[in-house]
Amino acid sequence: MNEHDLKSWLHACGFDLAEPLSAHLNDTIKNATTPLMHAARMGNAEVLNALLALGADPRLLNADSNGALWFACFADSTACAAALIQAGAPFDTQNINGATALIYCASAGKTPLVKLLLEAGANAALMTLDDFTALELAANRACMKLLKEAEGAAYA
């Protein structure tokens, strides 16, 4: 994706970025949403990778303490999630409810993303504010199996 197309996409999404673009990649709109978070939420790997290549920060959190990785998981985009993990996005960040991306993915039955997060080293023992782990919230048998295996490996 070239810079002109990226600027057009950003403008269409409500980001009014000044020149040079690289100095404003982490500017925010409503709810402290960055362009990277928005691209992740849309599951747009092309835009997400272009933003990362220009230096967008994958560690930033919005007003709810969700980061771009959370939004990639919400969008069910394994490609975006993998790119963000590779770029250094934190995967154990807990949002205002104490949920991590892994807890969200397990509770939503997003098995490929649960597998990706566990392989990246996500902590399956973290709990929500209500004291639930990803395993306890697993929405399907496949997620439950992956989480039980991770739990067993943690105690081995």
Show the residue positions of the predicted features:
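Ankyrin repeat A-helix N-terminal signature
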Residues: 9-12, 38-44, 71-77, 104-110, ...
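Ankyrin-repeat-protein effector appendages
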Residues: 1-15, 120, 129-156
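Ankyrin repeat structural motif
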Residues: 13-19, 44-52, 77-85, 110-118, ...
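Intrinsically disordered, low-complexity regulatory segments in ankyrin-centric signaling systems
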Residues: 1-42, 49, 53, 154-156
